[in-house]
Amino acid sequence: MKLGIVGLPNVGKSTLFNSLTKAGAESANYPFCTIDPNVGIVSVPDERIDRLGELYHSKKIVPAVIEFVDIAGLVKGASKGEGLGNQFLANIREVDAIVHVVRCFEDENIVHVDGSIDPARDIETINLELIFSDIEILERRISKIAKQARMDKTLAKELKLAEAVKAHLEDGHMAKTYELGEDEDDQAWFKMYNLLTAKPVI
């Protein structure tokens, strides 16, 4: 499993990454300390695997691992390329789930990118940028298949789904709250879009 650690600049993403992975990623009191993603792999202890290894006299026991990715900070306007926006969003698309770090503490020595501490605002900023990015993905797909959909029933069906999900996002909702139903084609297309707001969030 691959988890992406995301949040605004300077909220402690790299500090959390270092705590989880025992890595030595740079962590400093200025925005965009992290530019290229830091990657760390952590083994997951499991007594059941150890016990099975003993029972079957396994020569080698390979535990499950979690890959953590410390991703550059996001700012308002990232979906339009502000800050390291495009790079940030591309890095998030590669992960299985998002670990969202939100600053809830006051410290005048640590700069906040928006000048004040407001966790609810910060969460909304991140969520909106992810939503805007997903809308852009769907707009590109809709534009690509709209003409062909007039003569292709399968594409017409996909177009209907893409437009419905886009409308859901435009209402301010995350893709994961869209009621997809059990249609296998819809499920396959939805997965293909790889929408950021469809990913699990911790």
Where are the predicted features?
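Conserved G1/Walker A P-loop phosphate-binding module
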Residues: 1-111, 139
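Conserved C-terminal guanine-recognition region of P-loop GTPase G domains, centered on the G4
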Residues: 59, 85-202
